[in-house]
């Protein structure tokens, strides 16, 4: 399992994985809109300071997606890194390591991870 920054060629496969994982997530009350997801991923890939991080198995199949951004704090010029969205079947540890590497590369002083409000299958608690 490897994690790295994804590119435009990964968007279709990342969208399919997110759709599959969405069906069993705490977000199922919201309708999954694949066209909107593709548009958002394209924006993330092309925007400086934002990245689509992917975990892929040995066959190159995407197993996890972590959308990340690095920005300045509102109150000072120091930088922080945060996740926008994190969906993963496998390779979560590798994704977090890649996220930490990316944060360091962009000079982030702090990493802030969002935690889902609702975790019906207790996956988040088991992961962390």
Predicted features and spans:
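A short beta-loop-alpha structural element at the N-terminal edge
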Residues: 1-16
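Helix-loop element at the rim of GNAT/NAT acetyltransferase active sites that forms part
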Residues: 16-31
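A conserved beta-strand-loop-helix scaffold within acyl/acetyltransferase catalytic domains
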Residues: 28-52, 57, 66-76
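Glycine-rich phosphate/pyrophosphate-binding loop shared by adenosine-nucleotide-utilizing enzymes
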Residues: 59-65, 81
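A short, internal acetyl-CoA/4′-phosphopantetheine-binding micro-motif in the GNAT/acyltransferase core
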Residues: 81-93
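Conserved acyl-CoA
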Residues: 94-110
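Conserved beta-strand-loop-alpha-helix junction that forms the acyl-donor binding cleft
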Residues: 112-125
